[in-house]
């Protein structure tokens, strides 16, 4: 389903500095002048693959530094030229590229995104502030775009949550975490209870629980979004910023 991009109405309040302050947060969230805004759809995945924005040729940032990727241990950073573990190489998504809670109404994380439909590398390493609709109204999720894909619709966002389902790339997590596979649950959708998060490698369990705790196990929530400056906390993890 295509989503029409519409003007965004924020739940956050404007600080005197022109930044966006989450309801009970201290971090300043600064909008990008002329940046994207609208409404979008969401879903989840965790396929362990090297993300699209980790390839230098897909990057158009001031430093031309792509998203960091890691060796099979999920921790040791590898060169950007190393092939993805999902197609026979030895480069995987780093285990620290998981969502994390800032406070009761704000979280930081990462996403695969498209704003044109299909593969869209133009906004690699940009950040979007997502404001939840419906049951999660009052909460926000600030994500950095680190991946994209041919199966994405226009203005859609897919969040990498461990145990979120491997999707079309079924081999990466199996190879990275054998004998204790990190796929978890169904190919699409992943685990269906917080208790199943304990079946994942320990380093991935916090990101799995995030879905059930901060997101209250709401599947595929609708969001409004606005492009914002990437917080230092996110850039320190990905090593990339637009």
Curated annotation (Swiss-Prot):
Keywords, ordered alphabetically: Carbohydrate metabolism, Cellulose degradation, Digestion, Glycoprotein, Glycosidase, Hydrolase, Polysaccharide degradation, Secreted, Signal
Organism (species): Phaedon cochleariae
Family recorded in the similarity comment: Belongs to the glycosyl hydrolase 45 (cellulase K) family.
Keyword Hydrolase listed: yes
Top EC class of this enzyme: hydrolase
EC number: 3.2.1.4
Name of the protein in its database record: Endoglucanase
Leader sequence segment: 1-21
């Amino acid at each position: 389903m295509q989503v029409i991009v519409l003007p965004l109405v924020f739940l956050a309040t404007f600080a005197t500095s022109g930044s966006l302050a989450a309801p009970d947060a201290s971090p300043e969230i600064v909008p990008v002048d002329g940046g994207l805004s609208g409404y979008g759809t969401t879903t989840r995945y965790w396929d362990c693959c090297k993300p699209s924005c980790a390839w230098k040729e897909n990057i158009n940032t001031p430093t031309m530094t792509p998203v960091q990727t890691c060796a099979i241990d999920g921790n040791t950073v590898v060169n950007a030229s190393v092939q993805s573990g999902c197609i026979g190489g030895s480069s995987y998504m780093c285990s620290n590229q998981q969502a994390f809670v800032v406070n009761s109404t704000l979280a930081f994380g990462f996403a695969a995104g498209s704003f044109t439909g299909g593969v869209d590398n133009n906004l690699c390493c940009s950040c979007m502030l997502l404001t939840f609709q419906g049951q999660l109204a009052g909460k926000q999720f600030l994500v950095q775009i680190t991946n994209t894909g041919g199966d994405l619709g226009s203005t859609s966002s897919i969040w990498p949550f461990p145990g979120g389902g491997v999707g079309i790339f079924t081999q990466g997590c199996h190879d990275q975490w054998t004998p204790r596979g990190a796929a978890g649950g169904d190919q699409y959708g992943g685990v269906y209870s917080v208790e199943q998060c304990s079946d994942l490698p320990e380093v991935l369990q916090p990101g799995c629980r995030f879905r059930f705790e901060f997101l209250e196990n709401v599947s595929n929530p609708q969001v409004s979004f606005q492009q914002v400056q990437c917080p230092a906390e996110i850039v320190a993890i990905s090593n990339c910023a637009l």
